[in-house]
Amino acid sequence: MSESNVTEETKAARGFRKTRQGLVVSDKMDKTVVVAVEDRVTHALYGKVIRRTEKLKAHDEQNAAGVGDRVLLMETRPLSATKRWRVVEVLEKAK
C-alpha cells in the first residue's frame, strides 16, 4: 500500500470533525479563549427565527485571538474538563 492510501484510511477512521465560526468574548485565560457561536433556528410552531448563542471554550496555542476577533474553531479531543475545541485561524481581527 502507498503512503497516501494509509493516511486516507486513518482520516476515515478518525471521523468527521465539526467546525464553527464565532466571536471571541473573553481571552483572560492562558491559551484559552471563550467564543460565542450564534445559531439561528426557526420555531417549530410559530416559525419565528430565534438566535441561540452558545459559549465554547477553545484552545489557542499562540494566544493569537483577542476580544472581538472572528475565529474558526474545530472540534478536538477533550483538552480539559470544559475544553473540546481549538482555534484553527483568526478570520477577522477586531477593529
Curated annotation (Swiss-Prot):
Q: Which organism is it from?
A: Streptomyces coelicolor (strain ATCC BAA-471 / A3(2) / M145)
Gene behind the chain: rpsQ
**GO biological process, any:** translation
On assembly, the entry states: Part of the 30S ribosomal subunit.
Record PROSITE patterns: RIBOSOMAL_S17
Query: HAMAP family given for it?
Result: Ribosomal_uS17_B
The answer on whether this UniProt entry bears the keyword Aminoacyl-tRNA synthetase reads no
Tell me which family the UniProt entry assigns to this protein. Belongs to the universal ribosomal protein uS17 family.
Give the InterPro entries listed for this entry: NA-bd_OB-fold, Ribosomal_uS17, Ribosomal_uS17_bact/chlr, Ribosomal_uS17_CS
**One Pfam family of this protein, by short name?**
Ribosomal_S17
What name is this protein filed under? Small ribosomal subunit protein uS17
Q: Name one GO molecular function term.
A: structural constituent of ribosome
Q: Which domain of life is it from?
A: Bacteria
Any idea what job this protein has? One of the primary rRNA binding proteins, it binds specifically to the 5'-end of 16S ribosomal RNA.
> What are the record keywords, sorted?
Ribonucleoprotein, Ribosomal protein, RNA-binding, rRNA-binding
